[in-house]
Protein backbone atom coordinates (compact mmCIF):
# COMPACT_ATOMS: atom_id res chain seq x y z
CA UNK A 1 0.00 0.00 0.00
CA UNK A 2 1.22 3.47 -0.85
CA UNK A 3 1.96 5.21 2.49
CA UNK A 4 0.27 8.32 1.13
CA UNK A 5 -3.00 6.53 0.50
CA UNK A 6 -4.40 6.38 4.01
CA UNK A 7 -8.10 5.65 3.89
CA UNK A 8 -10.78 6.16 6.50
CA UNK A 9 -14.13 4.43 6.49
CA UNK A 10 -17.24 5.10 8.51
CA UNK A 11 -19.64 2.31 9.40
CA UNK A 12 -23.12 2.38 10.83
CA UNK A 13 -25.71 -0.30 11.45
CA UNK A 14 -29.01 -0.61 13.27
CA UNK A 15 -31.39 -3.48 13.98
CA UNK A 16 -34.51 -3.37 16.11
CA UNK A 17 -34.98 -5.61 19.10
CA UNK A 18 -37.27 -8.58 18.56
CA UNK A 19 -40.43 -8.41 20.67
CA UNK A 20 -39.64 -11.90 21.94
CA UNK A 21 -36.35 -13.48 22.90
CA UNK A 22 -35.31 -16.08 20.32
CA UNK A 23 -33.05 -18.60 22.04
CA UNK A 24 -31.60 -19.72 18.70
CA UNK A 25 -30.63 -16.11 17.97
CA UNK A 26 -29.15 -14.59 21.14
CA UNK A 27 -27.91 -11.00 21.16
CA UNK A 28 -24.37 -11.02 19.80
CA UNK A 29 -22.22 -7.88 19.79
CA UNK A 30 -18.60 -7.71 18.63
CA UNK A 31 -18.66 -11.49 18.31
CA UNK A 32 -19.62 -11.95 21.98
CA UNK A 33 -22.91 -13.65 22.88
CA UNK A 34 -24.57 -11.62 25.64
CA UNK A 35 -26.69 -13.37 28.24
CA UNK A 36 -29.31 -10.62 28.33
CA UNK A 37 -32.25 -12.63 26.94
CA UNK A 38 -32.60 -10.26 23.99
CA UNK A 39 -32.60 -10.84 20.25
CA UNK A 40 -32.33 -8.54 17.25
CA UNK A 41 -34.38 -8.81 14.08
CA UNK A 42 -31.88 -9.56 11.33
CA UNK A 43 -31.26 -11.83 8.35
CA UNK A 44 -27.82 -12.76 9.73
CA UNK A 45 -26.91 -13.03 13.42
CA UNK A 46 -27.50 -9.26 13.65
CA UNK A 47 -24.16 -8.29 15.21
CA UNK A 48 -24.49 -4.54 14.64
CA UNK A 49 -20.92 -3.86 15.79
CA UNK A 50 -19.35 -6.25 13.30
CA UNK A 51 -21.71 -5.02 10.59
CA UNK A 52 -20.61 -1.43 11.23
CA UNK A 53 -16.95 -2.48 11.11
CA UNK A 54 -17.59 -4.27 7.79
CA UNK A 55 -19.25 -1.13 6.43
CA UNK A 56 -16.33 1.04 7.56
CA UNK A 57 -13.80 -1.21 5.83
CA UNK A 58 -15.91 -1.51 2.69
CA UNK A 59 -16.35 2.26 2.65
CA UNK A 60 -12.62 2.85 2.93
CA UNK A 61 -12.12 0.46 0.01
CA UNK A 62 -14.81 2.17 -2.06
CA UNK A 63 -16.72 -1.12 -2.14
CA UNK A 64 -20.20 -0.07 -1.07
CA UNK A 65 -21.67 -1.61 2.05
CA UNK A 66 -22.44 -4.91 3.72
CA UNK A 67 -25.85 -5.16 2.04
CA UNK A 68 -24.24 -5.02 -1.39
CA UNK A 69 -21.89 -7.93 -0.65
CA UNK A 70 -24.14 -9.98 1.65
CA UNK A 71 -27.74 -9.10 0.67
CA UNK A 72 -30.56 -10.00 3.03
CA UNK A 73 -32.44 -11.29 -0.01
CA UNK A 74 -29.92 -14.10 -0.47
CA UNK A 75 -30.88 -17.22 1.53
CA UNK A 76 -27.24 -18.31 1.85
CA UNK A 77 -26.71 -15.45 4.32
CA UNK A 78 -29.70 -16.37 6.51
CA UNK A 79 -28.38 -16.70 10.04
CA UNK A 80 -24.83 -15.98 8.86
CA UNK A 81 -22.23 -15.40 11.54
CA UNK A 82 -21.10 -11.79 11.24
CA UNK A 83 -17.55 -12.85 12.11
CA UNK A 84 -17.52 -14.89 8.89
CA UNK A 85 -18.75 -11.90 6.90
CA UNK A 86 -16.04 -9.77 8.51
CA UNK A 87 -13.39 -12.32 7.51
CA UNK A 88 -14.51 -12.04 3.87
CA UNK A 89 -14.31 -8.24 4.06
CA UNK A 90 -10.84 -8.43 5.66
CA UNK A 91 -9.73 -10.75 2.83
CA UNK A 92 -10.89 -8.15 0.30
CA UNK A 93 -8.89 -5.52 2.16
CA UNK A 94 -5.80 -7.73 2.29
CA UNK A 95 -6.05 -8.50 -1.43
CA UNK A 96 -5.73 -4.76 -2.02
CA UNK A 97 -2.68 -4.58 0.28
CA UNK A 98 -4.47 -2.36 2.79
CA UNK A 99 -4.47 -2.94 6.53
CA UNK A 100 -6.16 -1.66 9.66
CA UNK A 101 -4.40 0.61 12.09
CA UNK A 102 -7.16 0.98 14.66
CA UNK A 103 -10.94 0.94 15.12
CA UNK A 104 -13.07 3.24 17.23
CA UNK A 105 -16.65 2.10 17.76
CA UNK A 106 -19.59 3.90 19.33
CA UNK A 107 -22.71 1.95 20.31
CA UNK A 108 -25.86 4.01 20.77
CA UNK A 109 -28.30 2.01 22.89
CA UNK A 110 -29.85 2.26 26.33
CA UNK A 111 -30.05 -1.50 26.74
CA UNK A 112 -28.28 -3.72 27.34
CA UNK A 113 -25.62 -2.19 29.51
CA UNK A 114 -22.34 -2.94 27.76
CA UNK A 115 -19.86 -2.05 30.51
CA UNK A 116 -19.89 -5.61 31.95
CA UNK A 117 -19.09 -6.99 28.48
CA UNK A 118 -16.71 -4.28 27.25
CA UNK A 119 -13.41 -6.08 27.96
CA UNK A 120 -14.61 -9.31 26.29
CA UNK A 121 -15.94 -7.36 23.32
CA UNK A 122 -12.65 -5.51 22.84
CA UNK A 123 -10.74 -8.79 23.10
CA UNK A 124 -13.04 -10.41 20.53
CA UNK A 125 -12.70 -7.47 18.13
CA UNK A 126 -8.93 -7.41 18.51
CA UNK A 127 -8.79 -11.12 17.76
CA UNK A 128 -11.09 -10.89 14.73
CA UNK A 129 -9.27 -7.85 13.33
CA UNK A 130 -5.78 -9.08 14.26
CA UNK A 131 -5.07 -5.85 16.13
CA UNK A 132 -3.58 -5.25 19.56
CA UNK A 133 -6.33 -4.52 22.10
CA UNK A 134 -4.83 -1.05 22.59
CA UNK A 135 -5.91 -0.24 19.02
CA UNK A 136 -9.53 -1.21 19.56
CA UNK A 137 -11.77 1.32 21.30
CA UNK A 138 -15.39 0.70 22.23
CA UNK A 139 -17.68 3.37 23.64
CA UNK A 140 -21.28 2.96 24.72
Predicted regions and their residues:
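Pyridoxal 5′-phosphate
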Residues: 138-139
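Short acidic capping loops at alpha-helix termini that bridge into adjacent secondary structure
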Residues: 132-135
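RNase III-family endoribonuclease catalytic core
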Residues: 2-119, 124, 129
Amino acid sequence: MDPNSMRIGHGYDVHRFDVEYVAAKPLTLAGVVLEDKMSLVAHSDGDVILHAVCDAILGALGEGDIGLHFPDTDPKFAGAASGDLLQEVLAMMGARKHYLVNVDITVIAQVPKLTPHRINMISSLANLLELPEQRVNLKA
